[in-house]
């Protein structure tokens, strides 16, 4: 009684401080609310078998990571820190995670694991389309061209232990049973040395035909970390398959941030990466913004040259990645570089640009919200993920949505207490209930026919009403004429019937007629008196 079921998700929430500390070691930041949302709502929709309560199964984590790192609109750059942190929990579990992690496969007898797979490949190979590993499906795209490694230099890298980054060591031939023995000449090397740039403390995943096992920092036969540089095909593919920093700083910043987090490059790697993906002016702007982000001992930005140069040097520093202090310097350097990329990608404050972002006719509300947030990041100094800016983002989302969606969102009850997530869900519901183009054409045609039928009916009714009115007026006129004639006839008859046969019509006396009436004037008629007209002389 009273017992609760512990799941991987609830376990991470109970040890959230440890999760944040681990994420900080990975040079990323994670938020608890987004952690729960991605684990319980987003990742189960990737159709890779991810449970809503989370899991520490490395295969499932790898499959989710592939989805997150997918290029283009199908990727999820905002979820990179969370899946990377979850992967770190599974590959290097702390004590409170170990009971939930599946037992690791037995380690190989020989340390040359990158050359030969120890067990059959997984049903779905844990590869990421972010990396330029060779895949059969990439041939369908004619542009841009994706280069593959020639394999010549990689054979030398995989058949002998290369020297460390700063401290040359004796060749591997002086050691017995070293892992750097040459591989047989008939065996083909792995496709790309950068397909799996993981930390040296992690065990390599199962090798397959599309995933390279050459790590940037790999433990050699003497237990020392070894350095693997970027390949030219990696840099070429990243440069030619992504827009420039000036054209789309958000997309290129997300790519470089993902590379910095997952590949853990050294100082030289960072300079090579920036020099390839950025122009000279863009690189100088990024470095300047990164140096502005350096903080002093009091936690506030500092301008002291010694502190700035110590944290973000412009010249090659003497940081030994084989030591903990050197790795800490590199982690801090990469964090400052990410901050410099984000700050340099922001344009001058221009709210008109934000207001100009409107939802397209066939654009989903989620995609529109992402574009709106990107405009906030690019053209304003505000962070759209900040809870204090949620009201502004919500109002912009309502006013700049499609007209039909915006009108319905404005009429929502208790709109003031609606969160941005509530508005997006309501907008998605309205968007999904929209009629198709065929339905819209059918509705317009039906409305047009109904309107014509209604107009025709109204015209017929008006014509009938005019006919009835005309008929009533004609009937009234005829009735008036007939009644007038009848009345005149009756009055004439009445007048004639009032005189007697010997009664005078002139004086109305009896005994004579009008021609013999003594009162009637006799004699010829005299001329009528002329009317005199006055003249001007009178």
Swiss-Prot record:
The keyword Metal-binding applies. PROSITE patterns: ZF_CCHC (PS50158). The record marks 131-132, 215-216, 478-479 as: Cleavage. The keyword Transferase does not apply. A motif (LYPX(n)L motif) lies at residues 130-134. A zinc finger (CCHC-type) spans 502-519. Signal peptide: none annotated. GO terms for cellular component: host cell plasma membrane; membrane; viral nucleocapsid. Residues 111-222, 435-499, 513-538 are annotated as: Disordered. Disulfide bonds: none annotated. GO terms for molecular function: nucleic acid binding; structural constituent of virion; zinc ion binding. A motif (PPXY motif) lies at residues 162-165. A motif (PTAP/PSAP motif) lies at residues 111-114. This is Gag polyprotein. It comes from Moloney murine sarcoma virus (MoMSV). The gene is gag.
